[in-house]
Protein backbone atom coordinates (compact mmCIF):
# COMPACT_ATOMS: atom_id res chain seq x y z
CA UNK A 1 0.00 0.00 0.00
CA UNK A 2 1.26 3.47 -0.89
CA UNK A 3 0.18 6.96 0.11
CA UNK A 4 -2.24 7.32 -2.82
CA UNK A 5 -3.84 4.00 -1.91
CA UNK A 6 -4.24 5.13 1.71
CA UNK A 7 -5.95 8.35 0.65
CA UNK A 8 -8.28 6.70 -1.88
CA UNK A 9 -9.27 4.02 0.62
CA UNK A 10 -10.03 6.64 3.27
CA UNK A 11 -12.10 8.82 0.96
CA UNK A 12 -14.15 5.93 -0.39
CA UNK A 13 -14.96 4.44 3.01
CA UNK A 14 -15.67 7.78 4.68
CA UNK A 15 -18.43 8.34 2.12
CA UNK A 16 -19.77 4.80 2.07
CA UNK A 17 -23.42 4.84 3.30
CA UNK A 18 -23.89 2.95 6.56
CA UNK A 19 -27.25 1.95 8.09
CA UNK A 20 -27.76 3.42 11.54
CA UNK A 21 -27.47 1.03 14.47
CA UNK A 22 -30.91 1.16 16.06
CA UNK A 23 -29.78 -0.70 19.16
CA UNK A 24 -27.30 2.10 19.92
CA UNK A 25 -30.01 4.69 19.27
CA UNK A 26 -32.36 2.99 21.72
CA UNK A 27 -29.71 2.63 24.41
CA UNK A 28 -28.51 6.22 23.97
CA UNK A 29 -32.00 7.60 24.50
CA UNK A 30 -31.90 6.41 28.12
CA UNK A 31 -28.72 8.30 29.06
CA UNK A 32 -28.16 12.03 28.57
CA UNK A 33 -24.40 11.50 28.27
CA UNK A 34 -25.02 9.21 25.29
CA UNK A 35 -27.54 11.44 23.49
CA UNK A 36 -25.13 12.31 20.67
CA UNK A 37 -25.21 8.65 19.58
CA UNK A 38 -28.93 8.93 18.83
CA UNK A 39 -28.21 11.83 16.46
CA UNK A 40 -27.85 10.29 12.96
CA UNK A 41 -25.17 12.80 11.90
CA UNK A 42 -23.03 11.94 14.91
CA UNK A 43 -23.53 8.17 14.91
CA UNK A 44 -22.79 8.08 11.17
CA UNK A 45 -19.24 9.31 11.87
CA UNK A 46 -18.51 6.38 14.19
CA UNK A 47 -20.02 3.96 11.68
CA UNK A 48 -17.86 5.03 8.78
CA UNK A 49 -14.74 5.33 10.94
CA UNK A 50 -15.10 1.74 12.17
CA UNK A 51 -15.79 0.63 8.59
CA UNK A 52 -12.60 2.42 7.56
CA UNK A 53 -10.63 0.67 10.32
CA UNK A 54 -11.86 -2.67 9.01
CA UNK A 55 -11.05 -1.89 5.36
CA UNK A 56 -7.62 -0.38 6.05
CA UNK A 57 -6.58 -3.16 8.43
CA UNK A 58 -7.63 -5.97 6.12
CA UNK A 59 -5.73 -4.33 3.25
CA UNK A 60 -2.69 -3.83 5.47
CA UNK A 61 -2.50 -7.25 7.12
CA UNK A 62 -4.10 -9.29 4.31
CA UNK A 63 -6.24 -10.93 6.98
CA UNK A 64 -9.81 -10.72 8.17
CA UNK A 65 -10.28 -8.26 11.04
CA UNK A 66 -11.65 -11.16 13.10
CA UNK A 67 -8.16 -12.73 13.03
CA UNK A 68 -6.49 -9.66 14.54
CA UNK A 69 -6.08 -8.58 18.17
CA UNK A 70 -7.52 -5.11 18.75
CA UNK A 71 -7.37 -2.76 21.75
CA UNK A 72 -10.06 -0.13 22.24
CA UNK A 73 -7.89 2.24 24.29
CA UNK A 74 -10.01 4.45 26.55
CA UNK A 75 -13.27 2.80 25.49
CA UNK A 76 -15.49 5.26 27.39
CA UNK A 77 -19.14 4.61 26.61
CA UNK A 78 -18.28 1.36 24.83
CA UNK A 79 -19.85 2.23 21.48
CA UNK A 80 -16.69 1.51 19.49
CA UNK A 81 -16.18 -1.85 21.19
CA UNK A 82 -19.85 -2.57 20.54
CA UNK A 83 -19.59 -1.68 16.83
CA UNK A 84 -16.48 -3.86 16.56
CA UNK A 85 -18.37 -6.75 18.13
CA UNK A 86 -21.18 -6.19 15.62
CA UNK A 87 -18.79 -6.91 12.73
CA UNK A 88 -17.51 -10.05 14.41
CA UNK A 89 -14.37 -8.71 16.06
CA UNK A 90 -13.18 -9.73 19.51
CA UNK A 91 -11.82 -6.50 20.96
CA UNK A 92 -10.09 -5.84 24.28
CA UNK A 93 -11.58 -2.76 25.96
CA UNK A 94 -9.82 -0.67 28.60
CA UNK A 95 -10.30 2.64 30.37
CA UNK A 96 -8.96 4.74 33.22
CA UNK A 97 -10.23 3.60 36.58
CA UNK A 98 -11.98 6.30 38.62
CA UNK A 99 -12.24 9.09 36.01
CA UNK A 100 -15.67 10.74 35.79
CA UNK A 101 -15.92 10.38 32.01
CA UNK A 102 -14.46 6.86 31.83
CA UNK A 103 -16.30 3.55 31.67
CA UNK A 104 -16.04 3.39 35.47
CA UNK A 105 -17.37 6.87 36.24
CA UNK A 106 -20.56 7.15 34.21
CA UNK A 107 -23.74 5.34 33.24
CA UNK A 108 -22.78 2.76 30.59
CA UNK A 109 -25.90 1.15 29.06
CA UNK A 110 -24.06 0.01 25.91
CA UNK A 111 -21.32 -1.73 27.90
CA UNK A 112 -23.90 -3.40 30.11
CA UNK A 113 -26.13 -4.49 27.22
CA UNK A 114 -23.22 -5.95 25.24
CA UNK A 115 -21.55 -7.45 28.36
CA UNK A 116 -18.28 -5.72 27.48
CA UNK A 117 -15.51 -6.47 29.96
CA UNK A 118 -13.48 -3.30 30.55
CA UNK A 119 -9.91 -3.67 31.77
CA UNK A 120 -9.18 -0.95 34.39
CA UNK A 121 -6.14 1.25 33.80
CA UNK A 122 -4.70 2.23 37.17
CA UNK A 123 -1.54 4.01 35.97
CA UNK A 124 -1.45 7.36 34.11
CA UNK A 125 0.14 5.73 31.05
CA UNK A 126 1.47 2.21 31.71
CA UNK A 127 -0.82 -0.36 30.06
CA UNK A 128 -1.34 -3.77 31.73
CA UNK A 129 -0.52 -5.79 28.62
CA UNK A 130 2.55 -7.73 27.51
CA UNK A 131 4.91 -6.54 24.78
CA UNK A 132 3.69 -7.15 21.22
CA UNK A 133 0.17 -8.14 22.24
CA UNK A 134 -1.98 -6.25 19.74
CA UNK A 135 -2.19 -5.84 15.98
CA UNK A 136 -4.28 -2.66 16.27
CA UNK A 137 -4.81 0.07 18.86
CA UNK A 138 -7.83 2.36 18.50
CA UNK A 139 -7.83 5.88 19.95
CA UNK A 140 -11.25 7.47 19.53
CA UNK A 141 -10.83 10.83 21.27
CA UNK A 142 -8.31 9.56 23.83
CA UNK A 143 -4.76 10.75 23.09
CA UNK A 144 -5.61 14.40 23.77
CA UNK A 145 -6.70 13.57 27.33
CA UNK A 146 -3.67 11.63 28.56
CA UNK A 147 -1.29 13.36 31.02
CA UNK A 148 1.87 12.29 29.16
CA UNK A 149 1.43 11.99 25.40
CA UNK A 150 4.91 10.68 24.62
CA UNK A 151 4.83 8.09 27.39
CA UNK A 152 1.42 6.89 26.20
CA UNK A 153 2.60 6.60 22.59
CA UNK A 154 5.69 4.72 23.77
CA UNK A 155 3.41 2.29 25.62
CA UNK A 156 1.30 1.83 22.49
CA UNK A 157 4.49 1.15 20.55
CA UNK A 158 5.47 -1.44 23.17
CA UNK A 159 2.20 -3.39 23.06
CA UNK A 160 1.90 -3.32 19.26
CA UNK A 161 3.23 -6.19 17.22
CA UNK A 162 5.72 -5.34 14.45
CA UNK A 163 3.81 -3.60 11.61
CA UNK A 164 0.90 -3.07 14.03
CA UNK A 165 -1.39 -0.08 13.53
CA UNK A 166 -2.65 2.79 15.66
CA UNK A 167 -5.73 4.66 14.45
CA UNK A 168 -6.13 8.04 16.13
CA UNK A 169 -9.44 9.88 15.61
CA UNK A 170 -10.97 13.09 17.00
CA UNK A 171 -7.64 14.73 17.83
CA UNK A 172 -8.58 18.42 18.38
CA UNK A 173 -6.91 20.74 15.90
CA UNK A 174 -5.18 23.89 17.14
CA UNK A 175 -6.80 26.16 14.50
CA UNK A 176 -10.28 24.66 14.89
CA UNK A 177 -13.06 27.23 14.96
CA UNK A 178 -15.23 24.96 17.14
CA UNK A 179 -12.44 24.42 19.68
CA UNK A 180 -11.73 28.15 19.86
CA UNK A 181 -15.42 28.89 20.34
CA UNK A 182 -15.62 26.31 23.13
CA UNK A 183 -12.63 27.92 24.88
CA UNK A 184 -14.20 31.37 24.58
CA UNK A 185 -17.27 29.94 26.31
CA UNK A 186 -15.11 28.60 29.13
CA UNK A 187 -15.26 24.96 28.00
CA UNK A 188 -11.74 23.52 28.20
CA UNK A 189 -12.66 19.84 27.95
CA UNK A 190 -10.13 19.81 25.09
CA UNK A 191 -7.32 21.80 26.65
CA UNK A 192 -4.63 20.13 24.52
CA UNK A 193 -4.84 21.08 20.85
CA UNK A 194 -2.69 19.56 18.11
CA UNK A 195 -1.04 20.51 14.85
CA UNK A 196 0.16 18.14 12.13
CA UNK A 197 3.72 19.17 12.94
CA UNK A 198 3.22 18.16 16.58
CA UNK A 199 1.75 14.79 15.59
CA UNK A 200 4.64 14.04 13.24
CA UNK A 201 7.17 15.01 15.92
CA UNK A 202 5.55 12.77 18.55
CA UNK A 203 5.38 9.81 16.18
CA UNK A 204 9.02 10.26 15.21
CA UNK A 205 10.02 10.39 18.89
CA UNK A 206 8.19 7.14 19.62
CA UNK A 207 9.30 5.16 16.54
CA UNK A 208 5.86 5.10 14.94
CA UNK A 209 5.67 5.62 11.18
CA UNK A 210 2.97 7.96 9.88
CA UNK A 211 0.95 6.42 7.05
CA UNK A 212 -1.84 8.94 6.55
CA UNK A 213 -2.99 12.17 8.23
CA UNK A 214 -5.97 14.37 7.43
CA UNK A 215 -8.36 17.09 8.60
CA UNK A 216 -11.96 16.17 9.41
CA UNK A 217 -15.23 17.72 10.56
CA UNK A 218 -15.88 21.36 9.81
CA UNK A 219 -19.58 21.28 10.75
CA UNK A 220 -20.73 20.31 14.28
CA UNK A 221 -22.30 16.85 14.49
CA UNK A 222 -23.12 16.03 18.11
CA UNK A 223 -25.56 18.80 18.95
CA UNK A 224 -27.07 19.67 15.55
CA UNK A 225 -29.59 17.51 13.69
CA UNK A 226 -29.35 17.70 9.89
CA UNK A 227 -32.34 16.78 7.73
CA UNK A 228 -30.20 14.88 5.24
CA UNK A 229 -27.16 14.07 7.35
CA UNK A 230 -25.38 12.03 4.67
CA UNK A 231 -25.47 14.94 2.22
CA UNK A 232 -24.12 17.29 4.90
CA UNK A 233 -21.35 14.78 5.62
CA UNK A 234 -20.34 14.64 1.95
CA UNK A 235 -20.25 18.45 1.83
CA UNK A 236 -18.25 18.58 5.06
CA UNK A 237 -15.70 16.09 3.77
CA UNK A 238 -15.35 17.95 0.47
CA UNK A 239 -14.68 21.21 2.33
CA UNK A 240 -12.06 19.63 4.59
CA UNK A 241 -10.36 17.83 1.68
CA UNK A 242 -10.54 20.37 -1.12
CA UNK A 243 -10.67 23.88 0.33
CA UNK A 244 -8.64 26.06 2.73
CA UNK A 245 -11.49 25.70 5.23
CA UNK A 246 -9.83 22.43 6.25
CA UNK A 247 -7.45 24.55 8.32
CA UNK A 248 -10.35 25.44 10.62
CA UNK A 249 -11.67 21.87 10.94
CA UNK A 250 -12.38 20.40 14.35
CA UNK A 251 -10.01 17.45 14.15
CA UNK A 252 -6.87 16.06 12.65
CA UNK A 253 -6.64 12.28 12.49
CA UNK A 254 -4.01 9.77 11.52
CA UNK A 255 -3.02 6.16 11.11
CA UNK A 256 0.52 5.05 11.91
CA UNK A 257 2.39 1.77 12.17
CA UNK A 258 5.12 0.20 14.24
CA UNK A 259 8.15 -0.56 12.09
CA UNK A 260 8.91 -4.23 11.56
CA UNK A 261 12.57 -3.43 12.28
CA UNK A 262 12.02 -1.82 15.72
CA UNK A 263 11.73 -3.84 18.92
Describe the role of every protein-language-model region.
Residues 1-128, 249-252:
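Conserved N-terminal segment of class I S-adenosyl-L-methionine
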Residues 82-85, 153-157:
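A structural alpha-helix within SAM-dependent methyltransferase catalytic domains
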Residues 142:
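Hydrophobic adenine-recognition pocket in adenosine-nucleotide-binding enzymes
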Residues 138:
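A conserved beta-strand element that flanks and buttresses the S-adenosyl-L-methionine
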Residues 147-155, 165-262:
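S-adenosyl-L-methionine-dependent methyltransferase catalytic module, highlighting the catalytic core
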Residues 68, 131-133, 164:
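Surface-exposed loop/turn positions
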